[in-house]
């Protein structure tokens, strides 16, 4: 621990609980090290990202069953590369049966530079920018989400590599309020099942191609 930063530099499982104000958990492990963090009833607020993963093989973030966990940065977040409440430069998986509340006060709620997998859990995400800002690939399965973003709601976008920027959604109940795009993929967008409602946006669903294989309801509002 150094000043207001707790650094995780080795592989392992780390269980975190309780409240903190002004402390960042930073994951800076070797590229061969997988890091598993279990959130077990956490409320974390910080000037910059509450959790920031800058190096590791893969980071796993588990929401403990029955717990509510909250992460927030601040409007004065000075880290332009990690302008989110939760940031990962490496592949990130979020799973579990708990609840995660995210408040992105500087820009984004969750920002992932590589691939983001989300399996299970309930999510309430607000952001002054994008709720989800993912670079390469976004897969969301078996979740319940309420999203309120001033810009894009759920976004994966890669301007440099057209082979990525893909999104896969299955068995979710997701409600999005967005100032710009509700659900956006620069690559292929595939929806297999679930209910997706975009209450307010300039574009409800956007992708290089959009494939809807099933689902109870896929609805969106396109405002002009």
Language-model segments: residues:
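Extracellular beta-helix/beta-solenoid repeat scaffolds
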Residues: 14-75, 86
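Surface-exposed, flexible loop/turn segments at secondary-structure boundaries
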Residues: 69, 140, 182, 191
């Amino acid at each position: 621990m150094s000043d207001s930063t707790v650094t995780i530099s080795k592989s392992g499982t780390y269980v975190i609980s309780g409240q903190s104000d002004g402390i960042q958990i930073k994951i800076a492990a070797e590229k061969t090290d997988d890091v598993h963090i279990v959130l077990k009833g956490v409320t974390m607020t910080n000037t910059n990202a509450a959790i920031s993963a800058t190096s590791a093989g893969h980071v796993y973030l588990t929401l403990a069953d029955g717990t509510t966990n909250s992460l927030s940065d601040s409007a004065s977040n000075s880290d332009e590369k990690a302008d989110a409440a939760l940031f990962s430069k490496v592949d990130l998986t979020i799973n579990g049966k708990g609840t995660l509340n995210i408040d992105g006060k500087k820009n984004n709620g969750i920002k992932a530079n590589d691939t983001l997998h989300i399996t299970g859990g309930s999510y309430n995400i607000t952001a002054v920018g994008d709720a989800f800002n993912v670079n390469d690939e976004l897969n969301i399965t078996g979740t319940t989400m309420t999203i309120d973003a001033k810009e894009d709601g759920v976004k994966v976008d890669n301007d440099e590599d057209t082979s990525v920027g893909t999104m896969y959604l299955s068995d979710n109940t997701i409600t999005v309020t967005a100032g710009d795009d509700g659900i956006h993929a620069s690559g292929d967008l595939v929806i297999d099942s679930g209910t997706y409602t975009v209450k307010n946006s300039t574009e409800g669903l956007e992708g290089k191609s959009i494939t809807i294989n099933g689902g109870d309801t896929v609805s969106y509002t396109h405002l002009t």
